[in-house]
UniProtKB/Swiss-Prot annotation:
GO terms for biological process: DNA topological change. A zinc finger (C4-type) spans 577-603, 617-645, 658-681. Mg(2+) binds at residues 9, 82. Coiled coil: none annotated. The keyword Iron does not apply. Residues 3-113 form the Toprim domain. Monomer. Belongs to the type IA topoisomerase family. This is DNA topoisomerase 1. It comes from Staphylococcus haemolyticus (strain JCSC1435). The lineage of its organism: Bacteria, Bacillati, Bacillota, Bacilli, Bacillales. The record marks 33, 139-140, 143, 148, 155, 300, 488 as: Interaction with DNA. Residues 129-557 form the Topo IA-type catalytic domain.
Amino acid sequence: MADNLVIVESPAKAKTIEKYLGKKYKVIASMGHVRDLPRSQMGVDVEDNYEPKYITIRGKGPVVKDLKKYAKKAKNVFLASDPDREGEAIAWHLSKILELDDSKENRVVFNEITKDAVKESFKHPRGIEMDLVDAQQARRILDRLVGYNISPVLWKKVKKGLSAGRVQSVALRLVIDRENEIRNFKPEEYWSIEGEFRYKKSKFTAKFLHYKNKPFKLKTKKDVEKVTAELDGDKFEITNVNKKEKTRNPANPFTTSTLQQEAARKLNFKARKTMMLAQQLYEGIDLKRQGTVGLITYMRTDSTRISQTAKDEAKQYIEDKYGKDYLSNRTAKGKQGDQDAHEAIRPTSTLRTPYEMKAYLTRDQHRLYKLIWERFVASQMAPAILDTVALDVTQNNIKFRANGQTIKFKGFMTLYVEAKDDKDNEKENKLPNLSKGDEVTATQIEPAQHFTQPPPRYTEARLVKTLEELKIGRPSTYAPTIDTIQKRNYVKLESKRFVPTELGEIVYEQVKDYFPEIIDVEFTVNMETLLDKIAEGDIGWRKVIDNFYGSFKLDVERAEEEMEKVEIKDEPAGEDCEVCGSPMVIKMGRYGKFMACSNFPDCRNTKAIVKTIGVTCPKCKDGDVVERKSKKNRLFYGCSNYPECDFISWDKPVGRDCPKCNHYLMEHKKGRSSQVICSNCDYKEEVQK
């Protein structure tokens, strides 16, 4: 038996670290938390100063037994769980279970799992930081007090199996508030005028800007006619040319939030998937002859700080690959209020390029690693330099403006450009080289009617960004929060955007009326600030909980007495049960709506609700094409006569045949655009709107 025992959370991490430390160290995994509050009871004694009652997590008995066996034989036990509050709490629970000496410095932390970083950390063990543990305990106890008190009220008054949590309730509120904005939105008419102009052989477009040298809003068609009536002929003059040089700086390296956002936009990954892949890259990848190496730094962080060593290595790579002109001369500033003094998410070595790592990674691991690597290296590169030009095109004091932009020096854009949540569809408007006084010819003046649009629903990326901007939750809570409100069927995804369900809105209304603090953004933000103060040792955790629980307990008592029972009525399905002939009804289940026989429990017939798209099956010519969902929740199209007809397609049939070969046409989506195609020949056309 080795003299030194090291305990980490996962087998993958254990395997990587044991190779670095050598034969004198035995590294084993605790498989995450080993102690927690019991599931069968609240586990917090509110009469005894909120003392938590921790028990060994069900199923962890054999793990704890092994940990005790190895700890008894070892001379030294090191606790090397993750470098955050959750990791500190795991170390503390392990210390208690194994009855380790509190005065010993046996806590080891590292931000990256590389040989040098791990070996260096073992030279500087420290004691467990109880302020960090207390911050985690406070969060856990607060969440338990909220969930364990509100959930039974919801079971009694609304429906069994419901829950309401501190952070999840605010996330649900954001989705519902946005939906209400959309419902209450009243579109307003407005117009635009776009002109197409020619200068010699070049053409460019410009948009209406001023009427009689003043800004003029085009609210109606009459406003447009007022402007166009003043135009005389097709000759216009260039009255101003404004050229500027603009620099565009690279984005900072990733934090947890920005990684989740960018992976959603660029890779179409859900937050949970992003974090799972990042964990794998952090804990270690087998690089064959090089051994197992952690490829990225710790992935739960809100810091944009980068170590000097990492900066120097990146700069050397950039100079060798692109030349000195591409080196950044900026001094990047880390975010104020970075928690726990972590670094940003970055590759542990710039020299391990995505191309070289591809052979050792799965497709999705490689895509995420490439994103992290490129974002980090780009953050250390020179800004891009853009030449912008604005042309004023005028006739009779009616002014149009054309804006153009060309890249003078690509800088970091050579490697990486940040994605945007909502890309505008404007094409690049390259402008001819014009001077003040030049004459141009209008080839077309085109008015267009528009209506203002409601605010868009939240994508997962936008919801994560909003939670971070509002300072709700921590890097480790974004993915689980979004996952929870989906699993509870409080929200659903439609076209990759969140829509509240009927159940979600009912739960929200009840929580809003009786537990206003729980869904209050400012209250939740203030609580996060208090948790940070606990971590910094500025306030005691019991005081924070006591200040909250006094008023919350009164809210619970009022809800139990006054909250009216909500009856979620079954909606008629409009068809009869094929088993017993009773009417079918639409019920709300854990995974959404489904059809069930109203004669339950005597008849237990159920079936899924299918949505037809108004197109006859192109294969059997009898059934209807219906929307279905795969096991991975991906939309596909099938025939209502299944299994008699096995028609299936990822692309949506449009109900027309190809004019070239008479095969059926389908709408094929690629990214944000769609095209009607024939799968049998090369025929293509634009989607009819």
